[in-house]
Regions:
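Transmembrane helical cores of multi-pass secondary ion antiporters/exchangers
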Residues: 1-416
């Protein structure tokens, strides 16, 4: 299949699955599309079992494997999705919660990676470094999944800022940690030039701080240009160029593209909106990026649903995946509870913050993409299967119940 054919097929499936969800299931759009995609995949498997001569599963698996999921997400869609998400997080709100967000996106990721890594190594017998790679890719909360659920759940604004801000930044931090650990665990295929902790620390600083600096510089330059223009079509195009071009420039400069996209989006969404856009331009920019967000979300969740055909399903792998769900939840609880406990003597937190942020820390497509991007090894199929099980549980079960958890903890309306 050509790239255009794959894109057309994904858009058709996203529209069809979204329609089925809207008319019948009536679930939050992203979750509903994923559920329908999984159901369609199950129907294909059943049809293949009933009519094996048709070879339906093999045909579909071949088509799915042609989709470079990791490349499509990590080098294409992710920059746009993060930029769109960051546009709608106000700097003033984030400034009030910056220390919580910073600790959860750094200390929290480190704690979660260690807990999952040691636990997964103990459960499966996997070498510790390889298990830590799994810990790194499953620890970040996915901003795409989180933002999709936040649109449907009526949470306390301060709590929503914590969850959204953390998900935007820990994604970039988690990716850098994953990159470092892949270089240490798989040195032949890794991207680090050396296997020392010094090299790892240098890479982390280069990727994280370099990405933030690039995002702020590009965002500021774009802001200055937009101040001189009053043409909504051109200004929408400029923001698109910033998100797409800036991400690719970050890749070329070997700095973090995700962190670049978040920093640029935050600056344009706050300072740019206030001082460089007319009311008409604000309306069009906001509407354009909301549509980009919705469309790419729909396509991404279709891709997650059909990636089941790329997963090796055995009883041992499924058991490891189910145990990984509990492991990921324990790690997430620790990643939330420790920073909040450290900050409690200095500031207050609303009731149920730890519970809601633990259950609302959804995993998503980024974890699957990182698992698929691992170099081939004897442990990759197990890591991919465990990742897929955790992600599906997180999006479907946690995503559908986080509203009820929030209601019991803080009196907000239910999600559905």
């Amino acid at each position: 299949m050509t790239l255009l054919q794959i894109a057309a097929a994904l858009l058709v499936l996203a529209a069809a699955f979204g329609t089925v969800n809207y008319l019948f299931l009536k679930l939050p759009s992203t979750i509903g599309i994923l559920v329908v995609a999984l159901a369609a995949s199950l129907v294909i498997v059943i049809a293949d079992a009933v009519f094996p001569a048709l070879g339906i599963t093999d045909t579909v698996r071949g088509a799915v494997l042609e989709i470079e999921f990791s490349e499509a997400l990590l080098e294409g869609m992710l920059g746009l999705l993060l930029f769109a998400g960051a546009l709608h997080v106000k700097l003033g709100d984030l400034r009030r919660e910056w220390l919580v967000v910073l600790l959860m996106a750094t200390l929290g990721i480190g704690l979660s990676t260690a807990i999952v890594g040691f636990g997964f190594s103990w459960i499966t017998g996997m070498p510790l470094m390889a298990a830590l790679v799994f810990g790194a890719l499953i620890s970040p909360t996915d901003p795409v999944a989180v933002m999709g659920v936040l649109r449907s759940a009526d949470l306390d604004p301060a709590l929503e800022t914590k969850i959204a801000g953390e998900s935007l930044f820990n994604d970039g931090v988690g990716y850098v940690v994953w990159l470092i650990l892949v270089g240490l665990a798989f040195p032949v295929a890794g991207e680090t030039e050396g296997g020392t902790l010094g090299d790892a620390a240098t890479l982390f600083v280069q990727e994280a701080l370099g990405g933030a600096a690039l995002g702020l510089v590009l965002g500021f330059v774009t802001f200055r240009v937009m101040r001189r223009i009053d043409d909504y079509a051109l200004e929408v195009l400029i923001t698109l160029a910033l998100a797409f071009g800036g991400y690719e420039l970050a890749v070329l400069l070997h700095v973090s593209g995700p962190i670049m996209a978040v920093c640029a989006g935050l600056l344009i969404g706050d300072v740019g909106t206030k001082h460089a856009m007319s009311a008409e331009t604000q309306t069009y920019v906001d509407g354009f990026w909301r549509m980009i967000d919705e469309i790419l979300n729909a396509v991404l969740f279709v891709m997650i649903g059909v990636e089941v055909f790329a997963v090796t399903i055995t009883s041992d792998y499924l058991i490891a995946g189910v145990l990984s769900i509990a492991l990921a939840l324990v790690a997430r609880f620790t990643a939330v509870a420790v920073p909040i406990t450290l900050l409690k003597p200095f500031r207050g937190f609303s009731a149920g913050t730890i519970r809601i942020m633990t259950w609302g820390g959804l995993k998503g497509g980024i974890s699957v993409a990182l698992a698929l991007a691992l170099p081939d090894s004897e442990w990759k199929p197990l890591i991919l299967t465990a990742t897929y099980v955790v992600v599906i549980f997180s999006i479907v079960v946690q995503g559908l119940t986080v509203g009820r958890v929030a209601e019991r903890a803080g009196g907000t309306p239910p999600l559905i």
